[in-house]
Amino acid sequence: MFTNKAILAVYQLPEECTLELVVRDGTGNLVNSCYVETFQHRGNIKFGDRQAQVISHFNQVIDLLRTSVSDSIDSMIRYVGEQGNDDTRALVVRAMNDFFPAKVGEAVFQAVQAALQGPGMLTTLMTRQLEFLGNTTLYNTRMLEAILHIVDTKRAPAQDVAPVDYINGPAKTPLWEPYVVQCPDLAPTGRVDVPDMHVTHNGQPLTTAWYPPPASLRPLLPDGTVGANPEPSAAGANFEPPSASSRNPDDGGSTPVDTVELRSATDVPENDHALRLLEEIARSHLPSHQQTHNMIVPQKDGAQGVVVTPDYAKSGCKVDMQPFHSYGGPNESHFAPMGIMLNYDKYDCGFVIPLEDPRHTDCNLWTEMPTMRDDFARQGRFWRYDLNVDHFRECIARHTHVYADGARLMGTFVFELVKGERWTLEICSYRDRQFRSALLARATPRLMHALGYGTNFGRFIIAMDPRMNLSDFPVDVMRPAEGRRPCVCQESRGAGPLMDELDFYFEKNWNELERRAQEGGEPKTLTRPTELIEALTALGKGTAFSLTPQKGSCVPTTMARMLRDRGADEWAVILEKMATSLALAAAKEGNPAEAFYRDMSSWTNDERSRAMQLITWKRLAINFGVKVSMRALGVRNGYRVSRAAIPKGVMALNNCELFGGGHVCPECHSVFQSAGERKMCTTLDLMFHQLFLLSTGDVWLGALVIHDPRSHVSKTMKGVNRGANGGVKYEEIRKVRQFMVKFPFGRTCPH
């Protein structure tokens, strides 16, 4: 088995052609075991009998090779180690044996399998998952590549190639199917076959698009076995088969659509003492080094690039994780743009991050634009830094500038409107389903006031094409108010011209910006929810915060249970209600924003008030950091010194003179005064931004855990009608304690 890889780019190809590849080894013999992925800009290009996949830019191929494969395999292997049973382990071991060079015979294999299935063997493997998985699989490149190339013998050869995307990677094998139900990030790309998914708006042309049939999911039974495909129910919304023009000629057309049903997620147990007791019992049986957060730290005195887990069980051994979580110090240079930067002249602020890798490379994320378009010099004291996308191909930090809601980071503006302070304006691009562009901004309250915004909503629209459909924006983005246009409002071919026009706007209106900044005002904002913040920061033996969805809750974290433990039942109820409404709105309407606000208008005044407090949660942030830089700082601090690990962002700011201290949200990197506020921000980001931008340009809503706590056989809620964009399909998984419902989301977002 070969582990070498190569990238071959072929130019000046006709619209329709077939490629063939001949590989010879050093002795001149043909090599027939190569695995090839082909990509094309347009046309009908095939490699053998397989169709090349369409991409918008070849940089996506580079990003894919550097990110998707290792991340997807790492997630899959970790899930097998944590949630697998005898059957899944047997499947993995058989796959390794079939594709390993030193393959053993069936008799020897059966003997090994029998030994592995002995009494207590599964428990031993589960409790020693780090040693078993880390030493035998994770760091064995041959085994990893063998797992990649497993194909499903029950499917046609043309269907063995999965659609390539940034989230799941190219691996699509039978090994994935048992994990799709409870781990949506590992699911192969599945999209709904619904004609005319693009909504028709007034004055906008109707565009049609074909969507491949959804991936088949089989139910995962409570004992861990995989059952037969669920039978479609006769009830539900009426679907019409797509017309012949909307079918894909390559696979013979579309598959029939199943029933539209939704399992109830509104019933929450009044007393979850039993659940908490079971959780404590389960934690007590874990090894001592797993009873705390599973952190990784660099081993400075060992081999270069080695990552080890702290030995918490060793007597007298303490590991201070603060340096690996935090950023900023009294004697440290400044590496990243922050929302508010004080005492700016005392620090070296080059925005270049030195990475502590064996080669001592630097992370040059930002490129300063010294002049405006047409070499027009700036007169005001502000600077523009554009994102250096070419740097992504060579940096070991493996950057991603795509946010979970489909926005893409464009750059930052740094303003010096008040002497001794500098404020950062973060700019992201966003497109609606008709490919029209807008710029979304994030700023501190004082900078928002200087820009002329009278309300602090968190994120806001600072530039847009006037033809944009406002219903396509994310839920937590402030739309332009009546009579208040954005800073830039003009028809544009893309986000780049809008960025240039915004640069000219700041130069043209610099005196007005400076005058408002000197006034020292701030935009209007909702009151601070003191009782909720006190509940979030209260200490106790109740449920700990976790990103793992819990039984009895449709919120994608344990936040609702935490609030109930601390006596904030009203906030827990409204959090659950918002999550359910957002899921239904996304399923029926595509983008959940407009449908969610329509649903919220029928709530009581108290419920609407609490919901708006949560929607505008980012107004409570005292600072923020640009996400792509904060992730790179996590790499610098030692989270990823090998290519096998996933970098983590900064979670805390040290109380330095430049930007103070605070707790950083790992999703959006907003800075809050307390850890409880940070946890709530993370929960809300998962609820609002469960959108993933795939390499095909399509955006899909991620899965939410929906569970009926009263019985293992879940209830169904009939009568869910099709949305305005043509329809919706729910995948039903029966007899599962925790099951996933993947809501299709058909808005295109090509960049």
Curated annotation (Swiss-Prot):
Residues 205-270 are annotated as: Disordered. This is Uncharacterized protein VP5. It comes from Colorado tick fever virus (strain USA/Florio N-7180) (CTFV).
